[in-house]
Amino acid sequence: MVQRLKTLYLESAVLKLQETFGYKNPHQIPRIKKIVINCGLSEASQNSKSLESAMKELSIIAGQKGVITRAKKAIAGFKIREGLPIGICITLRGDSMYAFLDRLINLALPRIRDFQGVSSKSFDGHGNYNLGLKEQLMFPEIDYDQIDKIRGMDICIVTNAKTDSEGFYLLEVLGMPFKEKFAN
């Protein structure tokens, strides 16, 4: 089954991007390569149940199992030893990536209280977009009664766009609700 957002990209976004930026080769047209969902857990080193709970919630949201990230080196100030679990990371590609992005844009983001749009200033200089969410409850798959703690997550949308303006236009054509227009 072809995802709705992938169809939108192939049928209209490619033409709009080609027309706007004047690409001659179809391989120059920006596309989304992957989406990385990251959740840092400060309490994971003391409480293994919180790690399991967060893993379950992120797996429900993303549709695939995550990888536990471990501390690379010890930091005494944070009471972290080398090898302790400190977070969860999920990388989405292909149809699952488009399905997640579709749910994020059309279901999750509009459920945020007082939502006016996402910032257009979160591009990294190479066309990739980073978004931080304060709670996982905005996703309809998560039930309020089933969670033990409200956790946030970082979402990184990686594109092969050369500039931020190309990445902005790609996400805008796909329906990302930006607060303001992109300014260099």
Swiss-Prot record:
GO terms for cellular component: chloroplast; ribonucleoprotein complex; ribosome. It is found in: Plastid, Chloroplast. Belongs to the universal ribosomal protein uL5 family. Part of the 50S ribosomal subunit; contacts the 5S rRNA. It comes from Mesostigma viride. Keywords: Chloroplast, Plastid, Ribonucleoprotein, Ribosomal protein, RNA-binding, rRNA-binding. One of its GO terms (molecular function) is structural constituent of ribosome. Its main location: plastid. The keyword Ribonucleoprotein applies. Signal peptide: none annotated. This is Large ribosomal subunit protein uL5c. The keyword Transcription does not apply. GO terms for biological process: translation. The gene is rpl5.
